[in-house]
Amino acid sequence: MAAETDTTLPELRETVASLPTGPGIYQFKNSAGKVIYVGKAKNIRSRVRSYFRDPRQLTGKTQVLVGHITDLEIIITSSEVEALILENNLIKELKPRYNVNLKDDKTYPWLVITGEPFPRVFISRNRTRDKSTWFGPYTEAGQLRSILELIGSIFPVRSCRYSLTPENIAAKKHKLCLDYHIGKCKGPCEGLQNEAEYLEMIGEIVRLLKGRTAGLLKELHEKMLTAAAELRFEEAAELKMQLQSLRRYADRQKMVAADGMDRDVSAIASGDDEACGVVFRIREGKMLGARHFILTNTAGEPEKKLLGKVLEGYYLKSPEAMPEEVLLSAQLDLEDTESLQALSREREEECPTRRKAVKFTVPQIGEKAHLVEMCRQNARHHLAEYLVQKQKRGEAAREHYGVKALGESLHLETPPKRIECFDNSHLQGTDYVSSMVCFVNGKPLKSAYRKFRLQSLEEACGTGSSDDYAAMEQVLGRRYGGSLQDELPLPDLIVVDGGKGQANSAKKVLDRLGITVPVIGLAKRLEEVFTPDADGPFNLPKTSPALKLLQQLRDEAHRFAITYHRNIRSKRTLETGLTTIPGVGEKIAFALLERFGSVDGVAAASAEELSQFAGKVKGMSIFRHYHP
């Protein structure tokens, strides 16, 4: 298990870095491709990244889970609620190993309007196929109860279980209950409200549950303001709660369709020569999963042709019958439509309960259009992820080839996987620094970068001369003979910026320390490669991957050295010019330089100018420093 984790986690961390930051669900898979865990997230990237932090911060069960992860897949949603619904559906469908006993596998509740003459409205978790109208499912039972209470407070709908047939009402079989006496029911049980009036009220409730809430929101808001103005604060507070509940309901999740239909949704995202198609699988109004397909060599292909290829590939491999409806991002070609209808007719023999032809539609507005757009959003994500991985594979191949080519060009026994490169920087013998950069498998390993500071060339060389060779010896001695020899592993190749003299200086240090690491020098002007044992340089072809890798190393070492040198020089300038003044720190010194242009500009400023900029006390201190 440990070996599997060590090889898998770096690849997964790269995948995690490209994940979106919006809501959705993620599925972890094992080496057999089986989903072993499904989770939801407000921020997919942040949540998934948390699994790959320091194992000591994870629970024992999570560590075991992470040890089995070899791949992951996500589905983007429009809201956290949609992610919650989808997570519940997928856990029920897939029964992932590591979700067992971790999730409450209850069935989400529905709101039911019965098909009786005087319909009742209530909550149920067990959906049945009868004449009732079902709304939901809802993710929060508490919110659903609030909606039911809201309906009861606005509409006098009956709560009793009486069988209100015309015969029972005429026979006065049922008596008025408490709800009638407190104004929550109009008494249809005794014929005090007719069926037509009652059904009209039920129609209003249905419109409310379908999201037509604007008028009701306005009415409740006006009632709340009136109650507050008349000092009926308790009633106003209750109306405010009803208003908040209704607003939450108006924003109910869109992933689950109230009609409970079986349908698939498919959309395409296209690049220059690649495309991605996604298929959402929705059953009984609930989305149970998604699949994506990468298509190559797609330049010039219309979206409808790509959709046809995706759907044919999907349904040919799908073991179940096609759904009643397929929502699309573009209209299919007639030929593709006919072939899919033919495939559907074949599958009907295995599913004789459904005889309707499949309906292929391209919705323009409403919830169906929302589902298509969400599907396209997922397609865009998968395509972007594919293109990033493709680019990384290409870069990795080039980097690997560069390392291999360099090893062959230098006649090394093995490719130099770890390379360290040194560069010196100074200004007329002052602020002398050296940098070391490290590349592993052709890529910078910045955690292994090091910088060295020498106070002067005299110290670097041990003499009064300006001997860059001796300076290089000093730096290499500190890297391979000092404390760093235990901190960092030895490289497979050492590169120094310079010609044969620098290469020989480096070799002298390594011989003295008993280190047998190959060393070369790379001269800037002609890009010549020098080795200590050769009489002269040799040149690599200008297009050689080996030369490109050496140039990248040398340029990175030079950049690192120059940056360090500039920082030291800037700090020294501040220390010698401004930070020696009492009360002037680095922050104020930089601000003064920005305001007056230079140290000379600060010295030439008047007491009034300095006081206005730095304050009276500090301003006068700076002025007296230059004008004692």
Swiss-Prot record:
The gene is uvrC. GO terms for cellular component: cytoplasm; excinuclease repair complex. HAMAP family: UvrC. Residues 214-249 form the UVR domain. This is UvrABC system protein C. Pfam families: GIY-YIG, HHH_5, UVR, UvrC_RNaseH, UvrC_RNaseH_dom. Residues 21-100 form the GIY-YIG domain. Interacts with UvrB in an incision complex. Keywords: Cytoplasm, DNA damage, DNA excision, DNA repair, Excision nuclease, SOS response. SUPFAM superfamilies: C-terminal UvrC-binding domain of UvrB, GIY-YIG endonuclease, RuvA domain 2-like. Gene3D superfamilies: 5' to 3' exonuclease, C-terminal subdomain, GIY-YIG endonuclease, UVR domain, UvrC, RNAse H endonuclease domain.
